[in-house]
């Protein structure tokens, strides 16, 4: 296994420079992160661990989430993930596979079975190890990390290890180690230098059975099972129709999310379908593609860089002040799209392929999701006079457009509408004054 270090970080920086050079030839989109935005901290034939670049490094527009990081862990079948702890709070979601995870904290050891759809909170400083017990399926986990020491930076610490990964015990002086363990130096050296196989290693069926038998509590005092995972996919969907399903977990569902002010959701959008345009009142959503292909479209205030007027500058009377631009990104497995609060956004699944999207919501406690099309379109709440004054059209015409979409949350996508016979419908272009976003 390759250990993260100077050479890999230099390779990552070189890759970023290449990506920046390529980016000069296309419109800048600070909200999209592709495969090249990840840095591999470790990888081998048995698994890999990669971390998305810091959000604030990409753009000052994302400085509000600079103290959050995303990462992905993949473990091949029948493998053991070495014990370690983070200087960060963690929430993870199991995207694929099943296994056993064990937590060590204070005088307790607790183990839990994990499977696809599970959400779990790992407190900072808790030692964690895991196994992928499947014979032919990867264990694929997405992680949201909230560093507690240096904003935007976190580290992994290995104690029960050797030379690869390096045990932090090796960094203490010989005298300190001999006194701490009451053991001669030569025995300590043999112990802390023996493991050289890497952070994820292959194990036997017998070892899997032994490690799987630890489910429950042991090794000390028993306490409430507060760290149990919560399965998002086993609850009733918040919304479902032939065009998609939405599953959401808030702190009221899984109380371990409450102090982090985070929520977790999964949207499974059927092929050639879309989520209705919507915005979040206060949460920033970190959307990661679990499976499938499609694209995101988001409306952003238009920024003119150095030519931007100062905030106290006034516009001539009657001149348009607010302008928007659309950022569009093709997405596939592992792609990340950041959705700031207030920004209208939609996701569209490709033809012949569903689009499954995982969202971590930050500052989610009092968030409200406002849909902008469909039966639950918030604009339907405008009174008659407000509709007429706002759109400059008769209220009946406005309402006719709003009522034309009978579905909510998940809708037929652009491709599906083109492929179906269209009934006579009111003109959206005439109402909004343009042909599209």
Annotate the PLM regions.
Residues 62-68, 78-93, 257-262, 272-291, ...:
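A short beta-loop-beta micro-motif enriched in histidine and acidic residues
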Residues 1-252, 263, 280-281, 359-361, ...:
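An N-terminus-focused feature that recognizes amino-terminal "leader" regions
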Residues 94-96, 101, 256, 306, ...:
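N-terminal domain-start segments of secreted/luminal proteins
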Residues 98-100, 293-295, 354:
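Structural motif
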Residues 290, 296-338, 356-404, 408:
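Catalytic lobes of large eukaryotic enzymes
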Residues 249-254, 270, 321-325:
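Active-site-adjacent structural elements in folded domains
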Residues 77-78, 114-134, 269-272, 328-352, ...:
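Conserved metal-binding segment of the jelly-roll/cupin
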């Amino acid at each position: 296994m390759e250990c993260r270090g100077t050479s890999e970080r230099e390779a990552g920086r070189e890759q970023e420079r290449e990506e920046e050079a390529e980016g000069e030839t296309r419109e800048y989109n600070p909200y999209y992160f592709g495969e090249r935005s990840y840095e591999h901290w470790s990888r081998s034939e048995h698994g890999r661990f990669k971390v998305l670049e810091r959000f604030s490094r990409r753009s000052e527009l994302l400085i509000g989430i600079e103290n959050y990081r995303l990462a992905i862990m993949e473990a091949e079948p029948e493998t053991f993930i070495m014990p370690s702890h983070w200087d960060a709070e963690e929430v993870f979601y199991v995207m694929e596979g099943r296994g056993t995870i064990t937590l060590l904290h204070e005088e307790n050891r607790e183990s839990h079975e994990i499977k696809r759809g599970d959400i779990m909170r790992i407190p900072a400083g808790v030692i964690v190890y895991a196994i992928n017990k499947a014979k032919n399926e990867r264990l694929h986990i997405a992680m949201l990390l909230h560093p507690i020491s240096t904003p935007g930076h976190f580290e992994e610490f290995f104690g029960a290890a050797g030379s690869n990964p390096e045990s932090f015990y090796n960094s203490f002086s010989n005298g300190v180690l001999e006194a701490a363990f009451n053991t001669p130096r030569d025995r300590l050296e043999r112990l802390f230098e023996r493991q050289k196989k890497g952070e994820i290693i292959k194990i036997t069926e017998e070892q899997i059975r032994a490690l799987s038998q630890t489910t429950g509590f042991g090794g000390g005092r028993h306490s409430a099972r507060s760290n149990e995972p919560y399965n998002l996919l086993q609850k009733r969907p918040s919304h479902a129709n032939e065009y998609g399903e939405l599953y959401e977990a808030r702190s009221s569902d899984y109380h371990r999310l409450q102090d982090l002010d985070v929520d977790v959701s999964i949207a499974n959008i059927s092929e050639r379908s879309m989520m209705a345009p919507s915005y979040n009142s206060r949460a920033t959503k970190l959307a990661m593609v679990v499976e499938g292909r499609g694209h995101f479209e988001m409306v952003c205030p238009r920024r003119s860089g150095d030519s931007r007027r100062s905030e106290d500058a006034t516009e001539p009377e009657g001149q348009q002040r607010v302008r928007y631009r659309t950022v569009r990104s093709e997405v596939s497995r592992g792609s990340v799209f950041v959705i700031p609060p207030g920004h209208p956004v939609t996701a569209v699944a490709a033809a012949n392929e569903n689009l499954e999207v995982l969202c971590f919501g930050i500052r989610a406690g009092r968030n409200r999701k406002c849909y902008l099309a469909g039966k639950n379109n918030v604009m339907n709440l405008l009174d008659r006079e407000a509709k007429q004054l706002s759109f400059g059209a008769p209220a009946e015409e406005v309402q006719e457009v709003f009522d034309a979409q009978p579905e909510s949350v998940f809708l037929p996508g652009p491709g599906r509408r083109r492929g179906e016979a269209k009934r006579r419908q009111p003109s959206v272009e005439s109402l909004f004054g343009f042909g599209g976003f």
